[in-house]
Amino acid sequence: MINIKKGLDLPIEGAPQQVIHDGSTVKRVAVLGEEFIGMRPTMHVRVDDQVKKGQVLFEDKKNPGVLFTAPASGTVKEINRGAKRVLQSVVIEVNGSEQITFGTFSDAELSSLDREKAKEVLIQSGQWTALRARPFSKVAAVDANPSSIFVTAIDTNPLAADPAVIIAENVQAFEAGLAVVSRLTDGKVFVCKQAGSQVPSSSIAQVEVHEFGGVHPAGLVGTHIHHLDAVSISKQVWHIGYQDVIAFGHLFLTGEIYTDRVISLAGPRVKNPRLVKTQLGASLDDLVAGELEDGDNRVISGSVLSGSISNGVHAFLGRYHVQVSVLLEGREKELFGWIAPGSDKFSVTRTFISHLAPSRLFKMTTSTGGSKRAMVPIGSYERVMPLDILPTLLLRDLLSRDVDSAMSLGALELDEEDLALCTFVCPGKYEYGAALRDCLTTIEKEG
């Protein structure tokens, strides 16, 4: 077992009951274009077109062969674009149950499945987009050969669902999905799980199960990759979430695209925090209707640390998200708040007297607790960074856009979520995820 000691389990109220319930009926679903880094679409549909579940909506010009398909049957109601014609979302009004189907495979056939056949089914069904590559965190290229593939069956994000609860409902599909994933590489498949959790193992020779314990970010794939098979500019690995492995298994066992998702609907503003069953790309306006306390709430697709704000054309469940978090908008100003005792505030530096009650949970809001200021190296980043890098130096280089130095300090290993805790504890209120993405984009462009 690998035990992570540096990090932080956010003491936030609103943790979900680890029991699966049916979610609200969803009337609209969407594919969010900006989730797919560097993607440039060639559209296959127009507004008012009728589409079947699994029908191609668009293809990626920058990653030829990667298809994006409809998560439900219905009518294309909106194709939203932003600045420079960037695709924001393709919105479908759900109606009917028509779908495109594929061939079925027995367990014996899966064990000897041809790699090209596995790729063909995943690509044509649109499920290939579940596979992402490090470095750069883009959808995996169809002609690439990864050193290894990581299956993330652990989640230490604040307010997250327990993967073991969800996998227990889909054991056969999960095992079949692992068989499919193992056909995509000559290297190892690392299944990373919480220490002591009941995630099933596999008899496949390529599959290795590794346990991680300790505090967040013990559950992030960046942590797993760093410890088990680190990447470089010339070496890539792929990774996939446990619910997408289940979807792979359902696809090959039944021939039907599986878009069900079990997510955590939680946070201080949720009346009844719990696990709910919904579908990929679900409208969060529909999903949270009647679920929230009155007030000015911020709905977040994903973790409170690294998720995306859900509003307008982006008010849908993200492709890679398995939780919806809700916080109160922290718009209030507090006079001389920095000298108050802070019995109801949390600080990693023990600035407030609340640290005398270490087990207390807080009704956190979106407030940053102050305005932007200088980056102050007081050891906060080192407290929450478990990877073998020098965080203060790396973060400084990211802000100053010193790409060469940032690359030498380990920027290629990281994704925005890996720096989310650094952003949270930063006295200067900097967004390090955005700075990292700018750096990675520059590195990729310059080769």
UniProtKB/Swiss-Prot annotation:
First-level EC class: translocase
Domain of life: Bacteria
Keyword annotations of the record: Ion transport, NAD, Sodium, Sodium transport, Translocase, Transport, Ubiquinone
EC number(s) reported in the record: 7.2.1.1
InterPro entries: NqrA (IPR008703), NQRA_2nd (IPR056148), NqrA_C_domain (IPR022615), NQRA_N (IPR056147)
GO molecular function, one term: oxidoreductase activity, acting on NAD(P)H, quinone or similar compound as acceptor
Quaternary context: Composed of six subunits; NqrA, NqrB, NqrC, NqrD, NqrE and NqrF.
Family classification: Belongs to the NqrA family.
Protein task: NQR complex catalyzes the reduction of ubiquinone-1 to ubiquinol by two successive reactions, coupled with the transport of Na(+) ions from the cytoplasm to the periplasm. NqrA to NqrE are probably involved in the second step, the conversion of ubisemiquinone to ubiquinol.
Designated name of the protein: Na(+)-translocating NADH-quinone reductase subunit A
Lineage: Bacteria, Pseudomonadati, Pseudomonadota, Gammaproteobacteria, Alteromonadales
